[in-house]
């Protein structure tokens, strides 16, 4: 599984790189808090409606133990998306950094 660190993600966001940052939390959780610039995708099928095969895609959920971003990563890569990474630390890591 390809991953991205908080510092790498922050740098991409600061540079306004064209990434698709996908939050796999529930809609209620997403509405309460998410990383700025994220889109809500509660299933891989929903994600695929918003994504192109050439997009740089970063999936995340609540923390390192959250399985939904792992599942989204696996399904997207199996469907042929080539540039997918998982932000393992997720929202907990992002918030901890302030």
PLM features: residue spans?
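A generic "binding-loop/recognition-motif" signal
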Residues: 26, 44, 90
